[in-house]
């Protein structure tokens, strides 16, 4: 399980160094093989260990190519999916087209989200967090049943 937000740097070749606390888990569970794709709802990337991505691919394969919405989701997620192998130094190369989509330059937030990571431009991440907090403070209390059961 991945959790927390960590500031990492992209080098001049577009590689990011995976924090040490995740490396062993990624090597053990995915042999360092990852898949990166775009988030179709936010200006960030989604980074999955290969076994987790294969579950997503199975679900995508069950969607209908005759349904325009389902086909669009398939096209966006699969069409942007890029395999990346963690190297011996614990780095992942993020494809240029993906970096461009998320506006990633040098400072990147690696955000753990259970079975995957999100990759955000640092400034965009902080803006998103502020927007999310502001939205929650303005919320009228219409919580889903699952959120009503969540006690912090």
UniProtKB/Swiss-Prot annotation:
Compartment(s): Cytoplasm, Nucleoid
Outcome of gene disruption: Mutants have no detectable phenotype under standard laboratory conditions. They are more resistant to trimethoprim than wild-type cells.
One GO CC annotation: cytoplasm
Major location category of this protein: cytoplasm
GO-annotated molecular function: DNA-binding transcription factor activity; sequence-specific DNA binding; transcription cis-regulatory region binding
PROSITE patterns in UniProt: SPOVT_ABRB
Keyword annotations from UniProtKB, A to Z: Cytoplasm, DNA-binding, Repeat, Repressor, Transcription, Transcription regulation
Induction annotation: Negatively autoregulated.
Superkingdom field: Bacteria
Domain SpoVT-AbrB: 5-52, 81-124
Protein family (similarity comment): Belongs to the MraZ family.
Described function: Negatively regulates its own expression and that of the subsequent genes in the proximal part of the division and cell wall (dcw) gene cluster. Acts by binding directly to DNA. May also regulate the expression of genes outside the dcw cluster.
Name of the molecule in the record: Transcriptional regulator MraZ
Native source species: Escherichia coli (strain K12)
Phylogenetic classification of the source organism: Bacteria, Pseudomonadati, Pseudomonadota, Gammaproteobacteria, Enterobacterales
Gene name tied to this protein: mraZ
